[in-house]
Amino acid sequence: APAGRKGGDSLALSIVREYIGEQTEVRCCHFPMSADSAEKEAVWDEVAAALVQEVEAGKQVGFITLGDAMLFSTWVFLLQRIGNPAWLEIVPGVTSFAAIAARSQTPLAMEQQSLAVISCTAPEADIAAALRQHDSLVLMKVYGRFARIKALLAQAGLLDAALMMSEATLPGEQCWRRLREVSDDQPLPYFSTILVNKQWEYAQ
C-alpha cells in the first residue's frame, strides 16, 4: 500500500482495510513527493523488485491505489519496471473525476462534446489553450495552484461553468460551485479537482 508520509498511514489502505483478511500481510511503502528524480526512481526500483520477488516466491500480491491505477498513479512507475508478465492483472478503478461527476450530478461529456483531462502542473499557455479548445475539462492537481487556475478560468469566461470538489466520496468531501466567490488563498486538500462543462447548467 502506498503511503504519502514515511511512517504514516495509507489512505488507500484505510479504505480497504475492513476487507483484508487477518492472515494477509500488509506493507506500507513511502513514495516521496519530491523533485529529486533519483530519489523517486530508487524507491520505484526497490518496491517493484520486492513485489516481483514475492510473486516468484509463490505469494499472491496486490498493490492498492486510489482512483484508477492507470491514471496519475504511482503504480504506472512500478508497471514500467515489472513489464507485462502473465501473472499480472490490473483491476479498473473509479477515477476521481468520475466520482466527482456523479457526486455533483454533472456530466463529463455529452453527444459531440470533447473532453480533456489536464494536469494543472502544465504550462499556463497549454491550460489556456485547452480551455479554449474543449467543451468539457477535468483540471487535476489543483492543490497549491488554485489562484493561477482560477485566473485562467476568469480570463476564459468559464468561472460560472466550473465547480471544484475535494476528497470526493470521502468523509471530508467539499464542493464549491461558485468559484468566483472562493478566495485565492482558500486552504484546499491535496485531492482537489475542477470540472468544467461549457454547456451544462448547474443546479444552484
Feature-to-residue mapping (PLM):
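Class I S-adenosyl-L-methionine
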Residues: A1-P85, K150, C175-W176, P189-T193, ...
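General beta-strand structural signal in soluble alpha/beta enzymes
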Residues: C28, F63-T65, I90-G93, M110, ...
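A short acidic, often aromatic-flanked loop/helix-cap motif at beta-alpha or helix-coil junctions
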Residues: P32-S37, F97, P123-A125, L170-G172
